[in-house]
Amino acid sequence: MKEIFFAVPGDIKTQSGGYIYDRRLALELGLQGRSLTHLELGNSYPNPTNAHASDAALALLALPADSIVIIDGLALGAMDAEVVAELKAQLVALVHHPLALEGDLDHTRRESLFNSERINLGHAKRVIVPSPHTAQLLISDYSVSPDRITVARPGIDRPDGTASLRNPPLILSVGIQVPRQGHDVLLRALASIKQLRWNATIAGPALDADYA
């Protein structure tokens, strides 16, 4: 059975949806008896410093040909295409969301990320995505063939005990505070039901201070 390396930029213990997904993926692979080694890449991705890009290239190019490397899309989409093309290990891409679709990117940077991610995905033996929507984006815009895509939907563990009813109800929205998460859509919808009593909490790091 091939050894698996999992390359993730930054601290995998970070409390965000993407990192929680990564941790659960690593856990499930371990429960299946797979040997998995975590490779921590620099935390500057998707805009890596020269040092972080160089360190990542050295670590990834050193992986043996009889191994598998899963690279989180936050890093893979911004990597030098020549480095990715030279990988000896079998590449599996994990794409949470295409980098070029993030908000607040100028045209030049958006085009650069789109091109690098499209090229790098072309080298992946398999691509893991969290939703059919992301899968369709990669098929239609990034030339990823459907037979290479695995949709692994995220989920939550079933809670113990019986949930208590709250009055008024609490509406909880969890996710990083950036435009594509749509917290503003939720707030506008809630503003239209002022005749009802409710509480709402938005929980997640403010990665876009102006939006938050």
Where are these regions (language model features)?
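N-terminal subdomain of nucleotide-sugar transferases
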Residues: 1-43, 63-67
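N-terminal beta-loop-helix "entrance" segment that forms/cooperates
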Residues: 42-60
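Active-site proximal beta-strand in glycosyltransferases
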Residues: 67-70, 84-102
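Short His-centered aromatic/hydrophobic patch
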Residues: 71-76
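Membrane-proximal helix-turn-helix segments that form the acceptor-binding/catalytic region
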Residues: 99, 108-127
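Carbohydrate-associated surface elements
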Residues: 133, 152-155
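Conserved donor-binding/catalytic core segment of Leloir-type glycosyltransferases
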Residues: 156-158, 162-181, 187-192, 200-203
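Glycosyltransferase donor-sugar binding loop
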Residues: 199-212
